[in-house]
Amino acid sequence: MRNLLLLPLMAMLFSGCGDSDLTPEEASAKKFDVILTVVENGVTFSIKTYVATVDDKDKVRGYFSDVASLINSLVDSGKVEPDVVKKYIADGINEKVPVPFNTAVLGALDLGLSAYNGFYAANVKDNLANKEKAVKVLKAIAAGIQSGVDPVSGDVNVLVNPLIGFTDWKL
């Protein structure tokens, strides 16, 4: 019985075996697509899960839409440093979202913001050429929010599985 449980896990791991024909730039772009997909899908899942637990779904969806607007305005301003992002979003949520929803909204966004902080620290902090990638991660968070509040579809922006062909996850 245990062996049967391992089959799907092994299939998932080995289906991502590397495509050795990729140039380093192509491999890096593909890995970055994986990061964007994971962040967007994670935020979407988190928000859909939270919205499913509350009574006033429309009100909560409105709060999350406000947060997506906050993130988009932050991206437009060009200030993408994690400390600025965290403070701007926390202040904006506390201003626009009443208690106790503000804490829940921040909690639902924690996955995406943690991923952003880790990505920034690893890839942008010492290499400002990657700042545009940081902007794309923030946009993926906003897209995940918008997908999460959509009561009908919730489809994400990525149409193909970016995990195909990878085993090396370092940019």
Predicted feature residues:
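Cationic, hydrophobic amphipathic alpha-helical membrane-interacting segments
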Residues: 17-171
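Sec-dependent bacterial lipoprotein signal peptides
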Residues: 1-16
